Amino acid sequence: MRFLLYSRPGCGLCEEMLAGLAALPEARGVPVEVIDVDTDLNTRVRYGHKIPVLLFAGELVCHGHLDAEEVHKALAHHRRPV
């Protein structure tokens, strides 16, 4: 499992979200793929107006600003024993 961070070059909020995510102990070791919303029209239409957008396991975690509580919930949900 990995995080997907929809972003664009020069986006200060995106850089803040990435740095904040890296600082969360529970998120350490979880890969983060940064996706430039401007490389694909469909992606730009879907996410371009609300970047940064953070997903985990295909589900929205937060957008605009990092929500540490939502990151914690997403990780806990997917790390539960089955």
Language-model segments: which ranges?
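Short Fe-S-cluster ligation motifs
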Residues: D40-P52
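Generic recognition of short, well-ordered alpha-helical segments
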Residues: E16-A19, R46, L66
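Non-catalytic, surface beta->alpha helical segment in thiol-disulfide oxidoreductase systems
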Residues: E59-V82
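Local sequence-structure signature of Cys/Sec-based thiol-disulfide redox active-site neighborhoods
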Residues: M1-A23
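Conserved segment of the thioredoxin-like fold in thiol-based oxidoreductases
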Residues: A19-P25, G29-V30, G48-K50
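A short, hydrophobic beta-strand/beta-hairpin element that forms part of a small beta-sheet core
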Residues: P52-L60
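Thiol-based oxidoreductase modules, predominantly thioredoxin-like and allied folds used
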Residues: V30-L41
